[in-house]
């Protein structure tokens, strides 16, 4: 086997670069991993949350090797509710027709332990996108809007995963302790 003369120089440099990059905590862009401390986890989507959004969250959690269980078997519950969708004209033509639309999706999330300790208080998340509207090509623009709605579902799902990522064992334990102290103070116990 005949190797190029530059290979012995490139190989150590490549190895050193990969060690340097992995050592500094570099990871590919995307959702950060959710801590294994947050399992078993239930994902509870209310009736107003589109199945595409709920399914996208569950899929991303499954890909992250998070054990998903029904609410009654889970130690933690991710509640996703109050989904809202808005479409409004953001620019108009000289003939007072819509030239651009902004699509916005909003959802509420919270994470509770099985004994109702809030790990993430109720929080609004939203995602939006603007697109040009051409009234002479309505069918294509409807398809574009549907594709954008799907992208917004995925972005919201990714935002939810980002919110779950900091919940490691230490943080969960600290939040539980704070909740216990608050309960003790409210009940008048030392």
What positions do the PLM features span?
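N-terminal segment of the mature soluble domain
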Residues: 36, 40-84
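C-terminal motif of bacterial Sec signal peptides marking the signal peptidase cleavage site
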Residues: 20-23
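Surface-exposed short loop/turn segments
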Residues: 79-124, 128-146
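Sec/Tat-exported extracytoplasmic proteins
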Residues: 61-65, 111, 115, 135, ...
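Solvent-exposed, acidic/flexible segments
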Residues: 46, 50, 54, 100-104, ...
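Bacterial N-terminal signal peptides that target proteins for export
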Residues: 1-13
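Bacterial signal peptide processing site
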Residues: 25-28
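C-terminal/domain-edge helix-coil "capping" segments
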Residues: 139-190
């Amino acid at each position: 086997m005949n190797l190029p003369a530059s290979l012995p120089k490139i190989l150590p440099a490549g190895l050193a670069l990969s060690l340097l990059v992995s050592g500094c905590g570099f990871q590919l862009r995307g959702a950060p991993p959710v801590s294994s401390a947050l399992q078993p986890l239930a994902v509870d989507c209310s009736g107003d949350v589109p199945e595409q959004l709920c399914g996208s969250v569950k899929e991303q959690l499954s890909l992250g090797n998070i054990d998903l269980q029904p609410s009654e078997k889970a130690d933690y519950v991710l509640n996703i509710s109050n989904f809202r969708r808005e479409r409004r004209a953001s620019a108009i033509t000289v003939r007072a027709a819509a030239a651009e639309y902004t699509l916005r999706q909003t959802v509420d999330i919270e994470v509770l332990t099985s004994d109702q300790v809030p790990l993430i208080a109720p929080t609004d998340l939203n995602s939006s996108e603007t697109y040009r509207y051409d009234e002479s090509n309505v069918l294509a623009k409807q398809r574009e809007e549907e594709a954008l709605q799907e992208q917004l579902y995925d972005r919201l799902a990714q935002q939810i995963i980002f919110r779950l990522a900091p919940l490691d064992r230490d943080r969960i334990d600290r939040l539980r302790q704070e909740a216990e102290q608050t309960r003790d103070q409210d009940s008048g116990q030392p």
